[in-house]
């Protein structure tokens, strides 16, 4: 059965994925990228990981990452970044009835 994702979540995940891929190209020497979206009973999850290294410390402080944080905050979600074994973005957005009415 296909998963029906609320528009607000789709838009946020698409925008964040595009920004993450742009950052990987600009700031990493990655040779592989993994993008995983999951539906859990209580939340939506997006995980983006690469196997590269940061070319500059400022790569973790840019406007793109701030925009990601703001987008997820507006959806009452959480976003974390990790620089271990490449760069990773972990996002969780709780499901709620209002979002499901946006389908």
Stretch-by-stretch model annotation:
Residues 45-52:
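Conserved DxG motif in ATP/Mg2+-binding regions
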Residues 29, 40, 83-85:
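Structural motif
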Residues 87-97:
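Short C-terminal beta-strand
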Residues 21-28:
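Short helix-loop "hinge" at the ATP-lid/N-box region of the Bergerat-fold HATPase_c
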Residues 57-87:
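ATP phosphate-binding glycine-rich loop and adjacent ATP-lid/helix-beta elements
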Residues 37-39, 81, 91:
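Conserved catalytic core of two-component histidine kinases
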Residues 1-18:
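Conserved short strand/loop->alpha-helix "switch" segment adjacent to the catalytic nucleotide/phosphoryl-transfer site
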Residues 32-42:
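Short beta-strand/loop element within the Bergerat-fold HATPase_c
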């Amino acid at each position: 059965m296909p998963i029906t994702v609320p528009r607000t979540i789709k838009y946020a995940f698409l925008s964040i994925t595009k920004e993450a891929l742009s950052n990987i190209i600009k700031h990493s020497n990655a040779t592989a990228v993994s993008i995983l979206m999951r539906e859990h009973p209580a939340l939506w999850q997006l995980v983006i990981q690469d196997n590269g290294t940061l070319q500059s410390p400022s790569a973790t402080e840019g406007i793109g990452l701030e925009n990601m944080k703001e987008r997820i905050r507006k959806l009452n979600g959480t976003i974390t970044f990790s620089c271990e074994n490449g760069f990773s973005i972990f996002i969780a957005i709780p499901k709620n009835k209002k979002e499901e009415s946006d389908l």
